[in-house]
A protein has these predicted regions:
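Short loop/turn motifs that connect adjacent beta-strands in outer-membrane beta-barrel proteins
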Residues: 12-15, 19, 56-63, 93-105, ...
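Outer-membrane beta-barrel "beta-signal"
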Residues: 134-136, 160-173
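Outer-membrane pore/translocation modules
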Residues: 1-92, 112-127, 159, 167
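Outer membrane beta-barrel transmembrane domains
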Residues: 102-141, 148-152
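Short, exposed beta-strand-loop hairpins at the edges of beta-sheets
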Residues: 153-158
């Protein structure tokens, strides 16, 4: 079973957002350090920090364009001497919107900015499509507070894997 804990902070201005995600995977059987939550040493941490820049186009053509680069953590070369700066580029478009229900489809590809001696990146064994998404969201309202709940399927054609995810946004400051 895959398990992770995410902290993030984001800033938004008009159609742009800038975010920093701190992702810590504590899945059983991981091949990296997943037993020291507060370890932030580049050579031995089980986490990674992801810097993300998004642009949401205007409402007439509501396309989300995203660029995400892992700037720290377990995105290292084989010798563990350099960060690979794996980068994920993504497009997402709403395919259905009605009242409190939304459905979105997306596609993303990955590559490493620093090859560091190999063709691999954090998301796959080579450059290419690593993310195909279909997501359904319901805007649940409780005491005048909206908390979006989503369910999504994600496919990684390069790795021949599929994932199911459930999530809720408890608050938005």
């Amino acid at each position: 079973t895959y398990k992770e804990f995410n902290n993030h902070i984001s800033f938004q201005y008009k159609g742009f957002s800038l975010a920093l995600w701190d992702t810590y995977n504590f899945s059983t059987g991981a091949t990296y350090n997943n037993k020291e939550f507060f370890n932030y040493k580049a050579h031995s941490t089980g986490r990674f920090l992801d810097a993300i820049l998004n642009y949401y186009c205007e409402e007439r053509f509501p396309l989300l364009i995203s660029w995400s680069t892992i700037v720290f953590g377990r995105d290292r070369n084989k010798e563990n001497t350099a960060n690979k700066y794996s980068t994920f580029c993504y497009l997402e478009y709403p395919i259905y919107t009605k009242s409190r229900w939304h459905a979105d489809a997306g596609i993303g590809g990955a590559f490493a900015l620093n090859k560091a001696g190999s063709k691999t990146n954090f998301y796959g064994n080579t450059n290419g499509i690593v993310h195909v998404l279909l997501k359904v969201t319901f805007d649940w309202t409780l005491a005048k507070h909206t908390m979006p709940i989503h369910a999504c399927m994600v496919w990684n054609p390069q790795a021949d894997r599929a994932f199911f995810q459930l999530g809720i946004q408890l608050f938005n400051l």
